Amino acid sequence: MAKINLIKRSDYDRVLITETLPYETPIIFSNDGLYDCIKGQSEASPFQKSLVDALILGKGPSLATTCTQPYLYKIRKNSLEYRRLALLHPISQWKIREFYRRYEKLILHYCSHSPASIRAPKSIASTFYSKNSWENVYKYKTGAVALESLDGYAKHTPSFFSYRGCDRLYKFFTSVDYFQLEKRFQSQMTLDVSKCFDSIYTHSIVWATKEKEFIKKNLRAGSFGDEFDVVIRHGNHNETNGIPIGPEVSRIFSEIIFQEIDRITIDNLKDLKFDVDYVFRRYVDDVYIFARDESITKQIYSTYSDSLMSFNLHANAAKATTQNRPFVTKKSRLIFGASDCVNIFFESFLQDEGRGVLIPKPIYSPWRLAKKFIDSIKVLCSQSDVDYDEIASFLISSITERIKRLVNSDISEMEKEVKRGYVSAIDVMFEVL
């Protein structure tokens, strides 16, 4: 019989681990210490308690209302540009924790309006797990969220909510949904929102959450948008233009706004029926439009652009692309090509035993293996006229998944030669990172 292990649903402190930090932090940096400080308050000394009260809980007349300024740092976006991320002050992170505690159900409600979103919170992440081969799927630090399909199986929840759809955009291009859309519709068009998070007007969360009938039945809903606005601004020096880039809570903030933009767009296309005459799918701020012909996709693009402008957001016309079947974008072509390279690479020195278990094959020249893979990626990028940055996230994700499966193996009872094989396999993968 499967072993059931309870994960406390009432443990809102886990928000501090999953929702308030950027994913792109050094691997040695986490909020585990912050979480432990909160959990150890009952046994802490008076001095420790006073520090936590002042620096985390924000207790005191001067700290309760004062906004905080995030620590800003940059990560590489591509060969020329950088992306600026925000590390929120602990007091602001605690305010986010309290907001989740009060409004978790309303967050789910406002993230359920759009049929177009392919990355949206669906439910509170699993309250229990069964001992099985999938329990460690989220053990290691990644940029993923908990998918609804694995909810109830995963031991290490990477997000407070379980999500419907895809945790990575590239998975959409290889999904059944994408292939079904290609069967049904002749034309595809892409829409990119210009400088999305930097351009979001924080007060627009109130515009997106004003539902009179729902608010009448749920009195606290009337203050949801206002409070979310205050919480986000508190961690960003009280700025109303732009939201902190990096934390998952910012993606949820934007998701609620975009759900309303999706809904307005569908309502304004009165002469067309969604999921019959056209469909669009949205991953955060990337929109993919599908329709019978190009004239309809352009009509939908124009309508969606108008909906964006009502929230002070704008489509980036320079990045718009249109194509007819077969739908092979530069991005999807890269992913398909990289997927082939990755599979050939791993099959040359790893054997899949099923149930998530990988066994290393004999490796005679780690450098030769690594170089062959690197050369194949070079050729792919050269043929597609792109930099490594375009497929870096896909490659890192693929390699990370294999490393996780290898290190989950119990090698304590294995012979020394077999153990050496595991180390060699991991060395090969680190060589190409």
Language-model region placement:
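Short, surface-exposed helix-loop/turn micro-motifs enriched in polar/charged residues
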Residues: 84, 275-279, 314
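Conserved two-metal-ion catalytic palm core of "right-hand" nucleic acid polymerases
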Residues: 1-245
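Amphipathic alpha-helical segments that form well-ordered structural scaffolds
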Residues: 95-102, 204, 256-264, 303, ...
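Short, surface-exposed, charged/polar-biased interaction segments
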Residues: 117-124, 212-218, 222, 270, ...
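Short aromatic/hydrophobic-glycine micro-motifs
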Residues: 105, 270-274, 313
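Polymerase palm active-site segment centered on the conserved acidic dipeptide of motif C
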Residues: 294-372
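Conserved polymerase palm-domain catalytic core
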Residues: 180-284, 289-298, 349-433
